[in-house]
Amino acid sequence: MFSPNFVLASASPARLKLLQTIGINPIVRPSHFDESKIVSDNPRELVEILAKSKAQTIAPDFPESLILGCDSLLVVRGEIYGKPNSPEEAIARWETMQGHHGTLYTGHTLIDTKQHKTLVRCGITEVYFASLDRPTIEAYVNSGEPLKCAGCFALEGKGGLFVDKIEGCHSNVIGLSLPLLRQILQELGYQIAQFWDSRSTPKNEY
């Protein structure tokens, strides 16, 4: 059975680690797409467009390949949060987030350049944040972790300490829904096992 190259259009270490955890060692090619070009008040629409744009940007360079693009956003109390632009912004966001619940949207696009097919899906997970005092918020932001993450937290890192519970897909919060990836691959006619250990180490193309 033909197994195309699997390409990750992202520089996210968390997404790469998720793929490696399930036995996929992709070619890594960050798209460097300018996300500021896309504006929408609809978070689901926004992450789907951004994920698709990232994958489409690099697709011409990879014939007979599968290109995976993803994008995540957190919505808390009606506000859409991507990555914070500064420590001060991260602190302000956490003061809003703490003690409340948010909705984490992750857009997924898989482009099959051999079959000339593109599938776009969105994973949605509810996240419930712990109540935190100001010193704890400042200490977490000063660790640097929130500045690298959509929504100002990393569930797989220190941020997991401050999440009381989630409803939905755990890996979706980290940046890539593994069950959703399996479903998309099946829709394209592939089985996830085709891509296990297809490469011994990821090939970074920065």
Curated annotation (Swiss-Prot):
Active site per UniProt: D71 (proton acceptor)
Subcellular localization(s) per the UniProt record: Cytoplasm
Names of required cofactors: a divalent metal cation
GO CC aspect terms: cytoplasm
Family matches, as SUPFAM superfamilies: ITPase-like (SSF52972)
GO molecular-function terms, A-Z: nucleoside triphosphate diphosphatase activity
EC number annotated for this UniProt entry: 3.6.1.9
Chief site of localization: cytoplasm
One record GO biological process: nucleotide metabolic process
A Pfam entry, by short name: Maf
UniProt catalytic activity: a ribonucleoside 5'-triphosphate + H2O = a ribonucleoside 5'-phosphate + diphosphate + H(+); a 2'-deoxyribonucleoside 5'-triphosphate + H2O = a 2'-deoxyribonucleoside 5'-phosphate + diphosphate + H(+)
Enzyme class: hydrolase
Keywords for the protein's UniProt record, in alphabetical order: Cytoplasm, Hydrolase, Nucleotide metabolism
NCBIfam families recorded: maf
Function: Nucleoside triphosphate pyrophosphatase. May have a dual role in cell division arrest and in preventing the incorporation of modified nucleotides into cellular nucleic acids.
Recorded family membership: Belongs to the Maf family.
Name of this chain's protein: Nucleoside triphosphate pyrophosphatase
Species this protein is from: Rippkaea orientalis (strain PCC 8801 / RF-1)
